Amino acid sequence: MSLFDHSLTKLHELLAAKEINVSDLVDVSYKRIADVDSKVKAFLTLDEERARDLAKKLDEVDASEKGVLFGMPIGIKDNIVTKGLRTTCSSKILENFDPIYDATVVTKLRGAETVTIGKINMDEFAMGSSNENSAFQVTTNPWNTDYVPGGSSGGSAAAVAAGEVPFALGSDTGGSIRQPAAYCGVVGLKPTYGRVSRYGLVAFASSLDQIGPITRTVEDNAYLLEAIAGHCPADSTSADLPVPPYRESLTGEIKGLRIGVPSEYIGDGVSEEMRKAVFDALNVLEKEGAVWEEVSLPYSKYALAAYYVIASSEASANLARFDGVRYGYRTDNADNLLDMYKNTRAEGFGDEVKRRIMLGTFALSSGYYDAYYKKAQQVRTLIKKDFDDVFTNYDVIIGPTTPTPAFKIGAKTDDPLTMYANDILTIPVNLAGVPALSLPCGFKDGLPLGLQIIGKHFDEATIYRVADVYEKATNFSKEKPSL
């Protein structure tokens, strides 16, 4: 049994009782990475020397006087900047980028005295649903290494599922925390837009991006969100609201809780095993005292199209900063300034990033702005209204995280539209800005299935309460892959 099979609370108790020390935890992490990462390929850069030095210092501290995250090893998705630790966004254009500052979430974690183990693989600039778009390596699913771990935070989900770290940070623009969490059988939360600072998150789509926690259990997830959430003066979109003690929301009580189940989330395109897993989960929650009814989110059918117009348009603007002048890769193949811009971007960006930049530039161009970008934003407003209407009568919305379990590596790389459809059930949440969590709810042919719980704006606490009740009434979160 690995130390990382324990909850954060239990690990903290062991530290406080001096039965283990921080160096033991760091040792477990690096040993596990050495043992299995040649198969999983989750980590891009390890920070071993600094991590071990910090662990030795923390060994001298009385853990009983510290918070639950004290001394805990963590992995950071490679689009979250870390001072003095390479941050690549899994792109050749940032292959040797060494940030001069920490993201706000990293600063908060350092304040909580966690230990950063290293930076984790992802789809390039967070654009992808399978982790196959990384310029450096393809992360695999620990449950079956022939299958994808999901994307774009597939490396973070795989690292946690494989027991390399007890928890990790990811980012979610259209499902990039929840979909990998579902595929890898772990717990992943996309917080309300504005709940967690984006300062230091390399921007993909600024109105959609949100950093969130990926963990083994719901309780661990609540602890990690509490540590990273809160207002940040450096991020004008972060909400100036108090951060609730999320761990205290895990009361075990959901009697009378009202659940809405969108008919659009359990209809055509959703596999039979996924549909059955959702209804089985609803039966579990019903026995615990909740009530559920079918509801409708009619504009969800337009979410995928609206998302790819909005996200690509914002990416087109955000990625204009990677030009070979200020930082990152610069081509050697240029006779003049214009050639330098063109060739740097042509050589530095991968195919999917180029595809989205082109799509976004087209949608923002003169003559097409009203027809595409403006219309997509109008659809976004209608999608948000759908959620608002349902939440007037219901506490949470529940459905599958993904239409199917994970697919084989290489199965969809030649068909971008089929790949995009993997996020059809997660994208509406980002467009509406509401929080949502995925947690394990079953297996099909040895691959995990994910249940998605969606909450009201800034009501992550209710999501955690429901998820915790379900997790404790089932055994799915206790299952581990055998690597």
Swiss-Prot record:
Reactions catalysed, as given in the entry: L-glutamyl-tRNA(Gln) + L-glutamine + ATP + H2O = L-glutaminyl-tRNA(Gln) + L-glutamate + ADP + phosphate + H(+)
Gene3D superfamilies associated with the record: Amidase signature (AS) domain (3.90.1300.10)
Keyword Ligase belongs to the record: yes
UniProt entry keywords in alphabetical sequence: ATP-binding, Ligase, Nucleotide-binding, Protein biosynthesis
Residues in coiled coil: none
EC category name: ligase
Pfam families (UniProt xref): Amidase
Active site: 77, 152, 176
GO BP annotations, alphabetical order: translation
CC annotations in GO: glutamyl-tRNA(Gln) amidotransferase complex
EC nos: 6.3.5.7
InterPro entries documented for this protein: Amidase (IPR000120), Amidase_CS (IPR020556), Amidase_dom (IPR023631), AS_sf (IPR036928), GatA (IPR004412)
Top-rank lineage group of the source organism: Bacteria
Molecular functions per Gene Ontology: ATP binding; glutaminyl-tRNA synthase (glutamine-hydrolyzing) activity
Family in the record: Belongs to the amidase family. GatA subfamily.
Function: Allows the formation of correctly charged Gln-tRNA(Gln) through the transamidation of misacylated Glu-tRNA(Gln) in organisms which lack glutaminyl-tRNA synthetase. The reaction takes place in the presence of glutamine and ATP through an activated gamma-phospho-Glu-tRNA(Gln).
HAMAP family attached to this UniProt entry: GatA (MF_00120)
Quaternary structure and partners: Heterotrimer of A, B and C subunits.
Entry protein name: Glutamyl-tRNA(Gln) amidotransferase subunit A
Species, as recorded: Shouchella clausii (strain KSM-K16) (Alkalihalobacillus clausii)
